[in-house]
From Swiss-Prot:
Protein name per its UniProtKB record: Major capsid protein
Gene3D superfamilies registered for this protein in UniProt: Adenovirus Type 2 Hexon, domain 4, Major capsid protein Vp54
Protein encoded by which gene: MCP
A GO molecular function held by the record: structural molecule activity
UniProt signal peptide: none
């Protein structure tokens, strides 16, 4: 037996090789999938009869623009397979060193750093956004839709909690961000990129500046601290952190020739989900107990599946995801916990309550328990209401179409006593999760209600 000192060159499997494997049928395959002519799925739907397919991860590491702090980076997604299943970003940030350190101060990146670093992700078709996921959406979605068994691991993947440094050193970071695109939850609505021969598909990442991500707080060894001091900037560093690696893995599916032929014969209809961030509105605090405030939810046409909303504390707007009354401070080394900003919440369609005024806890505990994947351990001021029976599935069952009854949607809130008496500043934020129908016709992707314009 001889040894070969040379490192073997391992090539990636090709599309044609993978399709050849998928087309092969053995005895067990016939029992699992049945004959091709009996498969009526448009691709593959979880826990339902499905066509044969094989998954193929592809590394995306080239693009246009800047994949550094404050930059915008666009990566092409070529048709390396028949369907796009998922996207995951891998990010490395180098260590940094401050010019000086003062006793009684601590520095840290914000929690879930990957959500904060990437201000938005836009999946585009012919330069028009098909889906845009904001930093706010990723934070909120993870709070309710990452199940309890995976929540801790997911939080660590995307950057962990506050990790304070009491020195001039800021540690390096390795981040993994599974991008929560709707089709990553159900391959039955995977993006049929192989059929979109007339479209150009890209993914665009917008990065926040370093000065938006690193915070300094006053945390004395004993006694109460004053909390927020300032954000760290490049000028505070002898060696500023840098993004040293940014890569994306795209998971594709390769299906059989029969599946491709069948879906090429007629228009191909697919359900999609799209979150829309509603413009934030500063809250004018009422002085009387029981007073309510109403906020319109302006969203584009589509089936309304769920609402996510909250009252963000913007006294120090540098805190990107703080939704409580009472700014965070340290007392004898323990970080303070704020209190809820709301007492009751209702949802109106037109001039009638679709959801009556209910205790705020209904929207942070009961609703997630019934319809989502995770119930927050305490009321952190982020709320949800799902019109659909099961928010995790892409099935829109229970969703409403406000245009059918020509009504607007609004969220009505009753501020808590703590908010009414607080000198702090707040804003109302909301995200509408809506469903649409896409279709493929003659090699082009279009949205059925909007003539191909994905905005």
């Amino acid at each position: 037996m001889t040894s070969n000192p040379e490192t073997p060159v391992v090539s990636n499997v090709t599309l044609s090789e993978l399709r050849s494997d998928v087309n092969k049928r053995g005895t067990i395959d016939s029992y699992i999938y049945g004959p091709d002519e009996q498969v009526t799925t448009y691709f593959v739907r979880e826990i339902r009869p499905c066509a044969a397919f094989s998954k193929m991860p592809v590394l995306l590491n080239t693009g246009n623009g800047s994949n550094k702090f404050g930059g915008t980076f666009t990566m092409p997604i070529n048709a390396s397979g028949d369907y796009l299943l998922a996207l995951t970003a891998y990010i490395s940030i180098s260590a940094g060193k401050l010019r000086s350190y003062a006793a009684g101060t601590e520095s840290s990146y914000f929690p879930k750093l990957a959500h904060k670093l990437i201000k938005s992700v836009r999946l585009k078709v012919d330069a028009k956004p098909l889906v845009e996921l904001s930093s706010n959406f990723m934070d909120t979605w993870s709070e309710f839709m990452i199940d309890g068994g995976n929540y801790e691991a997911y939080t660590n993947m995307v950057g962990g909690d506050f990790q304070y440094s009491r020195s001039v050193d800021i540690g390096a970071k390795t981040l993994v961000l599974p991008i929560p695109l709707y089709f990553s939850r159900d391959s039955g609505v995977a993006l049929p990129i192989g059929m979109m021969v007339n479209n150009r598909v890209t993914v665009e990442f917008v990065f926040r500046k370093l000065s938006d991500l690193l915070i300094k707080e006053n945390v004395p060894d004993t006694g109460a601290g004053t909390g927020f001091m300032n954000m760290l900037t490049d000028g505070d560093f002898a060696t500023p952190p840098e993004i040293t690696k940014f890569e994306v893995v795209a998971d594709f599916a390769v299906v059989t020739d029969f599946e491709i032929d069948r879906t090429s014969c007629s228009p191909h209809y697919i359900l999609m989900e799209k979150p829309t961030d509603i413009a934030a509105t500063e809250i004018l605090k009422p002085t009387e107990a029981g007073s309510t405030l109403s906020y319109d939810i302006e969203h584009s046409s589509g089936i309304l599946k769920a609402l996510f909303f909250g009252v963000r504390n913007i006294t120090h707007s540098e805190y990107l995801d703080y939704y409580e009354v009472g700014l965070p401070k340290s007392n004898n080394g323990v970080r303070s916990i704020g209190v809820s900003a709301l007492s009751k919440i209702g949802i109106k369609c037109g001039d009638r309550y679709r959801v009556p005024m209910l205790p705020a806890e209904h929207f942070v505990f009961t609703e997630p328990y019934r319809a989502a994947c995770r119930v927050p351990t305490r009321n952190r001021g982020q709320y949800m209401y799902s019109f659909a029976l099961d928010l995790k599935t892409v099935d829109p069952k229970g969703s409403i179409n406000p245009s059918n009854f020509n009504s607007s949607i609004s969220v009505v809130i009753e501020p808590s006593e703590a908010l009414r008496n607080s000198a702090e500043t707040f804003e109302f934020t909301a995200i509408a999760l809506t469903s649409y129908i896409l279709y493929i016709d003659n090699g082009s992707l279009k949205k059925i209600d909007n003539g191909g314009d994905f905005n």
